[in-house]
Design a protein with these regions (language model features):
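Short internal beta-strands
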Residues: 68-77, 158
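Conserved anion/nucleotide-ligand pocket segment
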Residues: 178-251
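N-terminal phosphate-binding or glycine-rich loops at protein starts, especially the Walker A/P-loop
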Residues: 23-67
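Bacterial Sec-dependent N-terminal signal peptides
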Residues: 1-22
Length: 314
């Protein structure tokens, strides 16, 4: 009996050790790699609620270690991740730390002002993307890349896995249709992490004038494009779980139509419907909720299809 118990304990220990060995280590967890770079620097961060190192935000970790964080740039949905899609997020102050949150869209050029850019020496990027051409976080990153080149600022990108990084799909964007929901000549599902995409932007000369930026990327460890990565935190209000993230590349196209895609429900991008789509057994009613204050077909009974029961493989 004792031998059996000992064998069981040894097997469990071996499994735990292997699991720890195979665990994906995010860029921001590798503090020994980037803390020396930050010494004596005035730091700005481009992040939001996803920029977590374990149970602490990158901002809090930097401040606890006495680094001089002077500014925050936040993307669509804001630094705390609770603003609506497309909602203008103005300059403010982070209530928890007192660090200024600077606007990304100042003046006629819709980019950070000269005064904002002169506040810091180095920009840290730590944000969770989902690997789609129309997901706006990478577009904000590209805008910041451009202005960092203009003001000769170094950029440190702490990379994270791409939850849709196991495949590439869709046509490459015709750049005459470049917009706020399509910024680079890449497929709809591009398969890259933000770090890989940033390196590609540099390598392909995609910044205006083919300018290069001073970029360092702290890559993930134990991550490959065959790795199935479950996001620990929803990246935005209407992508609350992996089902929404997996369906988003397909269902998002219908946002240009009057059809509701479940914004204002518990199943955003997992259902679709319209008041006039009679004949379907499934129905739902979009409501005003945080992250979807005024969703399409607000307070109207929509008939349609529930995709939430599909398997991830489908």
């Amino acid at each position: 009996m004792k031998k059996l118990l000992l064998l069981t304990l040894l097997l469990c220990s071996a499994f735990l050790c292997q699991a720890q060995k195979d665990r994906i280590i995010l860029g921001d967890e590798q503090t020994s790699e980037y803390f020396p770079i930050l010494k004596d620097k005035k730091i700005a961060i481009f992040s939001n609620h996803t920029g977590m190192i374990g149970d602490k935000h990158l901002l809090d970790v930097l401040l606890e270690n006495k680094f001089n964080v002077v500014a925050i740039f936040s993307p669509e949905h804001g630094f705390r991740g609770n603003a609506d899609a497309g909602e203008h997020v103005s300059s403010s102050v982070d209530s928890k730390t007192g660090v200024p949150i600077l606007s990304l869209y100042e003046g006629k050029d819709k980019k950070p002002s000269k005064a904002s850019m002169q506040k810091f020496d180095i920009l840290i990027i730590d944000i969770q993307d989902v690997g789609l051409r129309f997901y706006t976080y990478y577009i904000t990153m590209c805008r910041l890349m451009d202005v960092c080149v203009e003001y000769n600022k170094k950029v440190l990108l702490l990379d994270r896995p791409n939850p849709n990084g196991h495949y590439v799909d869709g046509p490459i964007l015709d750049m005459k249709y470049k917009s706020g929901v399509g910024w680079l000549p890449i497929p709809i599902v591009h398969g890259m992490t933000l770090g890989e995409l940033a390196l590609m932007v540099n390598g392909e000369g995609w910044l205006p004038g083919s300018r290069k930026w001073d970029l360092a990327v702290i890559k993930c460890k134990n991550y490959t494009h065959q790795t199935k990565y479950q996001l620990p935190i929803p990246p935005s209000p209407n992508l609350p779980n992996m089902k929404s993230i997996y369906l988003y590349p397909s269902t998002c196209f219908f946002e240009a139509t009057p059809v509701s895609l479940g914004r204002g429900t518990s199943l955003p991008f997992q259902v679709y419907g319209h008041p006039n789509m009679t004949g379907y057994n499934y129905s739902f009613t979009p409501r005003s909720i945080p992250g979807a204050k005024n969703p399409p077909q607000l307070n109207k009974l929509c008939h349609g299809v529930d995709l939430s029961t599909m398997s991830d493989e489908e």
